[in-house]
Structure formats: structure tokens, C-alpha cells
């Protein structure tokens, strides 16, 4: 009987990883840049999703992207998956701005990233991209 209960507990604990929460986030290559620089923004999700919708990128010009990369691996029977959407942006004007939420659908449910703050300063002498 103890073995039976123990096996059920192990089965339940291992099944929680199958139903784990979806992680969908946004990441900037830098949070502050000059008006003549570019920034890379990546939106990554750890489950296979569809219908990705980027933010409007208000106050920015898209100079590259979107590009998409997928990483899928199995190590010791455990699956690791990541899908990333990347854009290169060039600011249009100086100021502090918020890059809005992106969204993606995973298993019929919509997930959104958190908005990101970014600061655009005057043009700099030697721009350092990305």
C-alpha cells in the first residue's frame, strides 16, 4: 500500500511540470540609448504558440525583423523549448517611452508581456549598436 501511495505521489509531482505555467517575456539589449543608436528587442515564449502580435513600437522605426528562432532539445528525457521573435528598432525622438505589450496564443489562451521602459537621449558621438 505504501508503494502504491508513493508511486502516485511521484506521478503527480512529475505531471506538474507538464502543466507548468507559460513564460512569455520581452527583453531589450539596452534600456538607455542615444537617438542615433539601435536596440534589439526579443520576445520569448517557452511553449509552442501561435498568433504572435507585437506591440505598436510607437516612437520607434523598425529597421530589422521580425525574425524568428526556435530552440527545441531533449536532455535526460526532459524537453526544453523556446521560440523567440526579434526586432531591431531605431528611436524617432528623445524622451522616456514605454514599449507596450506583445501577445501570443498558447493552447487557446492569450499571454502578454509586461511593458518595458526605455530612455532615449541625444545622439552620441560613437554609437554602439546592440
Model-assigned labels for residue ranges:
Residues 1:
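GIY-YIG nuclease catalytic motif and its immediate N-terminal context
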Residues 4-17:
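Sec-dependent N-terminal signal peptides
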Amino acid at each position: 500500500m505504501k508503494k502504491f501511495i508513493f508511486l502516485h505521489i511521484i506521478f503527480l509531482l512529475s505531471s506538474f511540470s507538464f502543466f507548468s505555467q507559460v513564460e512569455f517575456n520581452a527583453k531589450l539589449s539596452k534600456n538607455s540609448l542615444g537617438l542615433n543608436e539601435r536596440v534589439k528587442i526579443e520576445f520569448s515564449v517557452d511553449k509552442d504558440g501561435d498568433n504572435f502580435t507585437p506591440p505598436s513600437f510607437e516612437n520607434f522605426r523598425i529597421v530589422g525583423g521580425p525574425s524568428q528562432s526556435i530552440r527545441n532539445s531533449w536532455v535526460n528525457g526532459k524537453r526544453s523549448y523556446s521560440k523567440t521573435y526579434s526586432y531591431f528598432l531605431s528611436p524617432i525622438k528623445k524622451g522616456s517611452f514605454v514599449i507596450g505589450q506583445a501577445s501570443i496564443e498558447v493552447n487557446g489562451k492569450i499571454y502578454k508581456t509586461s511593458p518595458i521602459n526605455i530612455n532615449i537621449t541625444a545622439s552620441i558621438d560613437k554609437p554602439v549598436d546592440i
